[in-house]
Amino acid sequence: MTGLVLAGYFAGYEINQLVPVHATVNLIGALWAAATVLTVYKDQRVESQKSFFATITAALLGSLIAVAYLLWLPQHVWGLAPIIVLAMLLSQVLGFADRGRQMVSMLLIIVIFSHISKNSPWVNAGMRDLEVFIGALVGLIGGYVGEQLPGLDDT
């Protein structure tokens, strides 16, 4: 498991080096990819596959909500609060109740990154989605390997 998390971290770091947006954001983005590995990886291939698609969907929805907020609403604590509630409600309505926290996490990290880096919300959202995809892919591959090699998550 440690190897998978490190693979996600280094892959996330390297992808951020290809598109150098901001040094701090790049490092946090690598950590975001590593954390995503932990979310997606399961001992069984089928469970990892389900987790992969749910994670990608939640990340994309969270990104879209974040971009809409950043482009069209005032940047204020009282402007963000209803958006968080909206994201949680949307996750319930769409049947992603177990991924609502992930949607909100994605929303918040994009808002935070948009305050650190003055790039377009689209760039920040795109990079965060790419980091999630990388981490999710590593977790998915780990699930396939983990099914063949029991005890992978013991390391």
Model-flagged regions — what are they?
Residues 1-105, 112-155:
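Alpha-helical transmembrane segments and their membrane-interface boundaries
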